[in-house]
């Protein structure tokens, strides 16, 4: 068999890049074959270096909510580039971005731009500790909050996929103040609060679990977290790197009607450029340097080209909020349709979804947390993924990642996808 261009590129890549990729899940490690190398993208399609076209349900892991290569975003980036790529100084567009978000999201009084979701989480946790004078953080098994040392505890995402529970190189001291609760289990959270004896600075949670596959919060779970944080004088941090500006313009906080003290953003806020952000209550955010004593900095934070991309996307989403209603309908058509196919075929699998995020779990038990997600048959998933890929449908190469819908996925494309699912399952 003649090697494909993707296979040849991967062969070259592994000699110079650890594992051949710059982020583990891209390696198709759970699938057992070389990853596809992508050359270009348009709308809901991506094209690999071998000339194959795929319907894409990764959306660059979430940022491309309007579809790939959206004209207005592309033009804003090109226009910004004409003025220079980076100045190392304050710019007007940073102010515009901050004002645009804070004026429209009630729980964000102030916001600070960074370069990734990981940076946003690291910073939010530092601020929470600085504000409360406490050290302990409660997180949930299966929730992924980036690759900072303190958060690599039962972290979901690529950590789950590779079968590595934590990470080498993380000293015990970095995680000894991280307390682990069970997602969707308020009792486990209250127990940790009681054990911590008033030393919990914050609870951090993916408002919708999206890195152990999609796991929706049970009714009352997020509200219960808010109440517990109030009771024990801790901050509530919503990690909205995935859900921010996706479930609603105001993210999961708006979608579920629960107000966090701090929130982290990524993905959509940068429209495909490396952008993260953290924000929230004014009295908390005023502790960030140079206004306060909690230090955080970044050479490229608030990069003008990245801000141009992100602000253009956010303005479009705010001005066209019918997109969120349409994405809900698309989610029902695709994920609801997949669930019906599973039922019609008598398969004992679970279809979880919230809005435009969805996961088909190859397990017979309802998936409500990390433990039930891990019961999935990853071998069966790998076979499903390969068959779908061969039919021109590109999904996350892991049982424990989400599918993403965009505004560019038409009903016709969704029906084409469902036809493939019928043949493959």
Q: How would you describe each model-predicted region?
A:
Residues 2-425:
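Conserved N-terminal phosphate-binding loop of PLP-dependent enzymes in the Aspartate aminotransferase
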